[in-house]
């Protein structure tokens, strides 16, 4: 009987311990989902200019997307600690109740803080991680993002700023090969593209203003005995300077970036260009040799008790040796009028203009969204939010990229820019459309 009495007591103690541990788990994340319709019929369509790397997102997102983050400080002694962080992401087309999808395992890393006595405040980390990402929320555009599996040492106090060092990887399919048979190369093996990142941040250079400088070097790291296709982009650099100014209860960020060769593709710090394309059974290099210039200004500010404003203006010039580059400029605003601390009206107006280096033709689009929103707070950043919206888009396009896969057109290299002709159309043409719906968005 004494033993039986001890069993409930032991279970109670164990439950208490598990509850305490469970309570220490950090549950964070992001999600968006909704329903929408298109004016001409059918489910909601989303609108993005051909050649533009992003779109204005308010009332213009057609998927359910979620990131579920679980993390916990697993050890702490004084100011030294270890933190384990994970992130699993899901994306579906939001067309049915049951939509099966394979999750993307985006983060799994450990961060050790203050482990080096002579570098107080610094953090050692290793694993898959979203690493110090820089983005424009309004257009969901990441202009400095080397996320992936990696390792690094960050936030080293150098007196006038914080120094961070990191190395990450982004593999590219179909980039390298050894001899397959009869001295013929079969380019199907992925290539490991490495990025080495150095950045100096939090340099106070004026009242309320800080400067961040960064350099990224990317290279294709082919296996021993394997070779890259002739003309592949083997390496490249990206340099970034960003000034952040605190102003009007918000911020303004001014960014200058320059990239070369393998770092020009996405222009955000990931190395690409070692893969190949195939046209008429002939392999050719999908290289990114050339350079990129980007000038960007964006921010979010408060214009009194009743008005908030997001804005962006950007010019980007990707000049490639293959002539497959673009000149893209975009400008947009999103004012918010607050009727009450939890109800607001938003208007988003955005314009994109993309000129093809190969064809000399231009695609353009403007998009307008009006939304009525209920949110948890009186800031333009307040979430969760539930909104109903109506979106109108008008575009005029004259060029596009040749399709790949089953839609490949004979005589046209997939991924290469071509002008529309009377026989073949590569763009969306000249048209307009409108959509409407409801959406929730949350981060926590």
Swiss-Prot record:
Its main location: membrane. One of its GO terms (cellular component) is cell outer membrane. Induction: By maltose. It comes from the Bacteria. The keyword Signal applies. The keyword Signal applies. GO terms for biological process: monoatomic ion transport. InterPro entries: G_neg_Bact_CarbUptk_Porin, Maltoporin, Porin_LamB, Porin_LamB_sf. It is found in: Cell outer membrane. GO terms for molecular function: maltodextrin transmembrane transporter activity; maltose transporting porin activity. It holds the Pfam family LamB. Residues 1-24 form the signal peptide. Keywords: Cell outer membrane, Ion transport, Membrane, Porin, Signal, Sugar transport, Transmembrane, Transmembrane beta strand, Transport. It is a multi-pass membrane protein. It catalyses: beta-maltose(in) = beta-maltose(out). Transmembrane segments: none annotated. The record marks 142 as: Important in sugar transport. Homotrimer formed of three 18-stranded antiparallel beta-barrels, containing three independent channels. Belongs to the porin LamB (TC 1.B.3) family. Involved in the transport of maltose and maltodextrins. This is Maltoporin.
């Amino acid at each position: 009987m004494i033993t039986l009495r001890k069993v409930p007591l032991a279970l109670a103690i164990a439950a208490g311990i598990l509850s305490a541990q469970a309570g220490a788990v950090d549950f964070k994340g992001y999600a968006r989902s909704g329903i929408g319709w298109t004016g001409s019929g059918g489910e909601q369509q989303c609108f993005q200019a051909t050649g533009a790397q992003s779109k204005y997102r308010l009332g213009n997102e057609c998927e359910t997307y979620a990131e579920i983050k679980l993390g916990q400080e697993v050890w702490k002694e004084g100011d030294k600690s270890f933190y384990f962080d994970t992130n699993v992401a899901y994306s579906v087309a939001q067309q049915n109740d049951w939509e099966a999808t394979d999750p993307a395992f985006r983060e799994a890393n450990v961060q050790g803080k203050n482990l080096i006595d002579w570098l107080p405040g610094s953090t050692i980390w290793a694993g898959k991680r979203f690493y110090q990402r820089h983005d424009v929320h309004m257009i969901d555009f990441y202009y400095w993002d080397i996320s992936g599996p990696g390792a690094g040492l960050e936030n080293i106090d150098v007196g006038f700023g914080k120094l961070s060092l990191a190395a990450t990887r982004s593999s590219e399919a179909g980039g390298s090969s050894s001899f397959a048979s009869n001295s013929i190369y079969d380019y199907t093996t992925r290539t490991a593209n490495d990025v080495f990142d150095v950045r100096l941040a939090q340099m106070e250079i004026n009242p309320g203003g800080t400067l961040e400088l960064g350099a990224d070097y990317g290279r294709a790291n082919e296996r021993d005995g394997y070779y890259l296709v002739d003309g592949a982009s083997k390496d490249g650099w990206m340099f970034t300077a960003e000034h952040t100014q605190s102003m009007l209860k918000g911020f303004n960020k001014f960014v200058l970036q320059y990239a070369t060769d393998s770092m020009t593709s996405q222009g955000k710090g990931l190395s690409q260009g070692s893969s190949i394309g195939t046209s008429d059974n002939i392999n050719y290099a999908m290289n990114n040799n050339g350079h990129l210039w980007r000038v960007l200004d964006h921010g979010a500010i408060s214009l009194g008790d009743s008005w908030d404003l997001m804005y962006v203006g950007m010019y980007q010039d990707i000049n490639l040796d293959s002539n497959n580059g673009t000149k893209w400029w975009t400008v947009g605003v999103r004012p918010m009028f607050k009727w009450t601390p939890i109800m607001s009206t938003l208007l988003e107006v955005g314009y994109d203009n993309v000129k093809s280096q190969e064809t000399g033709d231009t695609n353009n689009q403007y998009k307008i969204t009006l939304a009525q929103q209920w949110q948890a707070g009186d800031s333009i950043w307040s979430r969760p939010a539930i909104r109903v919206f109506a979106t109108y888009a008008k575009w005029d396009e004259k060029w596009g990229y040749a399709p790949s896969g089953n839609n490949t057109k004979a005589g046209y290299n997939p991924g290469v820019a071509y002008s529309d002709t009377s026989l073949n159309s590569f763009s969306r043409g000249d048209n307009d459309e409108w959509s409407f719906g409801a959406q929730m968005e949350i981060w926590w």
